[in-house]
Every structure is written in structure tokens, then in C-alpha cells.
Regions:
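N-terminally biased helix-coil "hinge/interface" segments that flank
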Residues: 1-524
Length: 524
């Protein structure tokens, strides 16, 4: 059996999966350790054998969205001063004017003076987390590794950009590395608390973490690359929705309704839309491959404030809805108005009883505008799903799958907008279902250098001699074959980098890097 747990900012949801959803449980997330332990105690009895636990969380994403990230610095290795391009986003950058060229050759090595000056700079600014990023490092990470080793020996937490992505988009790699560094300690603390809570009850069960692309990885891998799991919570919700949508061919929107934020996902032919080239979070354009999500600052616990004569919907949570004993009326109370006397009492108490119609129209207009923005975003470029690519496809959804705790309360508003609304069974724990059923994201990295006549896939200790005629077609086949030997799931190539090594005017070899992984999906 499998347990899925989603740790959100408001609630922790958990499910026990066997032949379907056997048990489910929801508890407040105020104390992370206690909420995880309580969830496990409610789901497990002595006769159950737990095969794995998969976890998703929005806690790190919430920290980034609210600006609650740690001080982090970037050690930039390139041949031109670029720090001024990032100074409004990254306060602490040290540029070392060493560099590797586009062929991966070291043109100017790192000097001891650069390293010692950078060390002094970061210490004086009380920086503990450092991201090291070298231009063209995917073609040769030697300078990143040299700097990374130096800073580690001096007590810093270090993230090297080339370990996060093999793509050559230098600006996005800088931002990805910075983001990973700035959540390094926060993420480790969250993961450590989760792991210790689980281990207090289940000593040997495999623990997996949901990635932003909807796959799951062992907790030991996730902790090395925290940036890959930043949108873990929304990804789990989308994978949980896939459980309900696998037989649908229409365009669909999924809305995961939360306390003060709701996440919007997109489906075409029962397949979620994906950001293949990398997501943007706040001002951070990254190389993190993720399921496409659009956040709407509205949830079941959102309250109403007035600025003069203007109604303002607040996304600052002030407690549970009034009808459930909270301090103020919320979107949930509005949805229940006319059915729940407690909700009506709350609107009277706040002097809003004569403004019900205005508030409802504002909510409906607010949701409509965000859905239009979300659909426009999907249609603004070529559409990729986890199964296929659409070049001139127009996404035009008529149906909405509502999940999350506030789903029943949002239906009233979406009905008014003309959508066909579906609320599935176990809607309130859809995210935990997605975490439980998401496929393991087995990944293999192939490196080949025809000049040195060597090929390696480190994850499986595979090494092979190759000849000068070896190319990317053969490399892809090896990756596919090796992945298929360890999994029955569909596999895909997610990164490919090939460049010719030139001496004089002659091509003397090829350097090839191929990354393959299991396609995101469900294990059933």
C-alpha cells in the first residue's frame, strides 16, 4: 500500500491507497512534525504493509512568493561583467573574470586571488549559501567544481549551476541556481522535519518527494536539488486530477481551491500542459521543467475589505470561515449565503448584508478575469503536454474540474460563468492522491566524448568505449534502452546537448549529453 501526503500552508492532507482510496485524513499544518505524525497514525494500523510514502508541499513555494527566502550570493564565472543585469534581483554577486569558451575549453583559469577576494566578500556580507555559475559549464563544469569545492571547504552551503540543468541558457541557469541557494536551508529543514516524523513511525519505508513536473524522486535526491520540487504541491494536485481525467478527450481546466490561493492547471486529451523550457516564479525565470500552473489569489478563506467605495479581496488569511467559527466572513460564507444561518449572521455583523450582490459579482468577475489570463497564457505560445506537442492548437476549455477543500463553494461562481463543473470523489484530498500515485522519475544522464572514445551513465555505473562515428542518435537509443530495462513506464528525452569539438578548421570529435527520464504519469 502507498501513502500520499500533501503539506500545505493551511492543511495537511493524507490518503492511504490500496485498491482505491482506503482512508483519508485532513489536519491543520500549524505544526509540521505533529501534522505528519497525526496523519500517519490515523492511516496506519499494525496489519498494513506500507510500500512507500510520497510527499508534496507548497511550503517552499509559499516562502518564495512571500519573499521569505534566505540571503544567498552568486559567484559568477564569465568573461564579461554581467552582475549589473541581476543586481535588482540578486543583491550579492561576485564576478570572477575567468571563463570557459563555447567549446568547453578553459581559456582563463580561476585565480587564488579571485577565490580569496570572493570569500572575503561573502563573509563580510554574512552570506552562508552560495550559488556557483560558470558560462558554458554544461560543456565543462571544471571551474564550477573548483570554486564549489573551495567554498565548501570554507563552510558554505554551495549549489553548482551545472548540476541543476544541462541547458545552455545562462541567464536562466543563474536564476535557477540563485533560487536553489536561497531556499537551501529552508528546504533542508522542512524535509528533515518530514523525514524524522515519518521515521518515528515507519523505519524503512521508501520516502519520495513530488517534483514540479509531476514525477517523484527519493528524498535523498530531492534534498540535493530543492529547486526541482518548488511547485511540488500544484504538481501533485494536477497528477491527482489525472486520476479522474484519464478517459477525457476534451480541453479541461483544473482549479485546486485552497485557503487564500487557488492553482489553475490545464489538460488537453487527458494530458497536463507542461512548461518545457522552465517556469517563472515571481521575477525568477528558471530552467525548472514543470507542469504549467497559474495561481489565483483567491480561496475559501479569503476575506473582503473596503478601500473607500472599492471592494478588495484579501489573500491574507485571518482564520476559518465565519460559518465554521472563524472571526470574519469569507468566500465560503458567501457561497453558503441563503443556506447557512451562521453565514448570514456574519454578513449582518460586518455590515455587509446589503452588499451581498456586489461582493458576489466582484468574485465572479475576479475569477473570470484570472481564467481568461490563464487561458491566454497557454495560447500565447506552442503548447506542450507530457504526451505531445501542439504547434497551432487553440486551448478552449468548456469544463472545469474543481478540487481542494473549497471546491463545493466555488461551484456556485463557476456555474455563473457557464462552465460545466465537475467535483470528483475525494476532491478534498486530490493533491495527496496525486502524490501517492505519481510515477517514480527515474533519470539517466549519458555523457559521451568521441575524442576521448568514452561514454558514461553514472547513475547505473555504465561505461563504454565508443568510436569517432558515435552520434546523438545512438546516444538516445542507449538512454531509451537502459531506462526501459529498469521500468515499464513510458520514457522521454528531456535534455539534449551536442557540440562539435574543433581544432583549427577541422572537427575532431563530438561532446554529447543526453538526459532521459520516465514520463510523468500515474503508476496505475
Amino acid at each position: 500500500m502507498i501513502i500520499g501526503i500533501d503539506v500545505g500552508g493551511t492543511h495537511t492532507d493524507a490518503v492511504l491507497i490500496g485498491s482505491g482510496v482506503l482512508k483519508k485524513f485532513k489536519t491543520p499544518s500549524a505544526d509540521l512534525k505533529k501534522s505528519v505524525i497525526l496523519a500517519l497514525e490515523k492511516l496506519i494500523d499494525s496489519n498494513i504493509d506500507i510500500e512507500r510514502i510520497s510527499i508534496s508541499t507548497t511550503l517552499v513555494t509559499n516562502s518564495i512568493s512571500k519573499g521569505n527566502i534566505e540571503k544567498a550570493g552568486i559567484f559568477l564565472i564569465c568573461d564579461s561583467p554581467l552582475s549589473f543585469l541581476y543586481e535588482n534581483i540578486i543583491p550579492y554577486i561576485y564576478t570572477a573574470h575567468s571563463y570557459i569558451d563555447h567549446r568547453g575549453e578553459v581559456i582563463k583559469d580561476l585565480s587564488s586571488n579571485d577565490l580569496s577576494s570572493a570569500l572575503e566578500y561573502f563573509i563580510s556580507n554574512k552570506i552562508k549559501n552560495i550559488g556557483v555559475v560558470s558560462k558554458f559549464s554544461p560543456r565543462n563544469p571544471v571551474l564550477e567544481k573548483k570554486a564549489g569545492d573551495f567554498f565548501r571547504k570554507n563552510g558554505f552551503n554551495v549549489v553548482e549551476g551545472s548540476t541543476l540543468s544541462g541547458k545552455l541558457d545562462f541567464p536562466r541557469r543563474i536564476m535557477t541556481t540563485y533560487l536553489s541557494s536561497s531556499v537551501y536551508s529552508i528546504y533542508r529543514s522542512i524535509i528533515s522535519d518530514m523525514e524524522s516524523s515519518i521515521r518515528s513511525i515507519l523505519k524503512d519505508t521508501e520516502i519520495m518527494i513530488v517534483k514540479a513536473d509531476g514525477g517523484v524522486v527519493p528524498i535523498s535526491d530531492a534534498i540535493k536539488r530543492p529547486v526541482d520540487t518548488i511547485l511540488s504541491g500544484p504538481a501533485a494536485s494536477i497528477m491527482g486530477s489525472l486520476f479522474h481525467l484519464k478517459d477525457f478527450s476534451e480541453d479541461f481546466i483544473i482549479i485546486d481551491t485552497g485557503g487564500t490561493t487557488s492553482d489553475i492547471g490545464f489538460f488537453i486529451n487527458s494530458s497536463p500542459v507542461i512548461e518545457r523550457d522552465g517556469i517563472s516564479i515571481n521575477n525568477y525565470k528558471t530552467l525548472v521543467r514543470a507542469l504549467k500552473v497559474f495561481s489565483m489569489p483567491l480561496g475559501g478563506d479569503s476575506v473582503f475589505n473596503w478601500s473607500g467605495n472599492e471592494l478588495v479581496i484579501s489573500n491574507v488569511r485571518e482564520g476559518i470561515p465565519y460559518c465554521f467559527g472563524g472571526p470574519r466572513v469569507t468566500v465560503t460564507d458567501l457561497a453558503l449565503f441563503g443556506e447557512n444561518k451562521k453565514s448570514e449572521e456574519g454578513f449582518i455583523k460586518e455590515g455587509l448584508i446589503d452588499k451581498i450582490k456586489i461582493i458576489e459579482e466582484k468574485i465572479i468577475s475576479f475569477i473570470e478575469s484570472y481564467l481568461k489570463k490563464a487561458i491566454s497564457l497557454v495560447n500565447s505560445r506552442h503548447i506542450y503536454t507530457i504526451k505531445e506537442f501542439f504547434e497551432n492548437r487553440v486551448f478552449n476549455p468548456k469544463k472545469v474540474l474543481l478540487v481542494g477543500g473549497a471546491a463545493p463553494y466555488f461551484k456556485r461562481f463557476l456555474d455563473r460563468l457557464g462552465y460545466e463543473v465537475i467535483i470528483p470523489k475525494d476532491y478534498e484530498v486530490c493533491n495527496a492522491i496525486g502524490a501517492a500515485l505519481a510515477r517514480p522519475s527515474y533519470e539517466l544522464n549519458l555523457f559521451a566524448n568521441t575524442l576521448d572514445a568514452r561514454l558514461s551513465i553514472p547513475e547505473i555505473d555504465y561505461y563504454e568505449k565508443i568510436d569517432r562515428y558515435f552520434d546523438e542518435t545512438l546516444a538516445r537509443k542507449i538512454v531509451f534502452d537502459k531506462l526501459k530495462s529498469i521500468t515499464n513506464f513510458d520514457v522521454e528525452i528531456v535534455e539534449e546537448e551536442v557540440f562539435n569539438m574543433v581544432r583549427g578548421f577541422n572537427t575532431i570529435g563530438k561532446n554529447i549529453r543526453i538526459v532521459g527520464q520516465v514520463k510523468p504519469g500515474l503508476i496505475i
